[in-house]
């Protein structure tokens, strides 16, 4: 049991050093990848509401935005919302699918560090 705990801890530490935009994971929808992208590119604005950025899990803020349609949110994520939201959240290596997964991750409140 102790050996498993040590191995799990080591795997978690190694996983935290992976650059999410260059990960070799085959499943882009994996929550851990979304979390890594969120922490590297989205956290600094969205966690603290910089320039009105909706925080992960802020149901009221996300519901207001979702009323425009999820497609609009994804388009805004991809192309940005000048002057406050840069295109792709500055994650140039992120695919549209990566951004869609991170968007869902934030809407459902899994982004908190």
Residue ranges: model-predicted function:
Residues 24-40:
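Short N-terminal segments immediately surrounding and downstream of signal-peptide cleavage
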Residues 1-7:
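Bacterial N-terminal signal peptides that target proteins for export
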Residues 55, 76-100, 106-113:
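Axial heme c-ligation environment in periplasmic c-type cytochrome domains
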Residues 13-20:
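C-terminal segment of classical bacterial N-terminal signal peptides
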Residues 46-75:
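Gly/Gly-Pro-rich "capping" loops immediately C-terminal to redox-active cysteine motifs
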Residues 41-48, 102, 106:
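The canonical Cys-X-X-Cys-His
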Residues 38-41, 49, 69, 81:
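Short pre-active-site segment immediately N-terminal to redox-active cysteine/selenocysteine motifs
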């Amino acid at each position: 049991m102790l050996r498993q705990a040590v191995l799990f801890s080591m795997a978690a530490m190694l996983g935290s050093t992976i650059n999410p935009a260059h990960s070799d994971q085959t499943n882009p929808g994996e929550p851990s990848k979304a979390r890594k992208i969120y922490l590297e590119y989205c956290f600094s604005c969205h966690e603290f509401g910089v320039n009105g950025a909706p925080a992960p899990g802020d149901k009221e803020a996300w519901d207001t935005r979702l009323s425009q349609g999820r497609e609009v949110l994804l388009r805004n994520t991809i192309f940005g919302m000048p002057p406050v939201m840069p295109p792709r959240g500055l994650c140039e290596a992120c695919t549209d699918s990566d951004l869609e997964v991170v968007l869902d991750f934030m809407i459902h409140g899994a982004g908190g560090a």
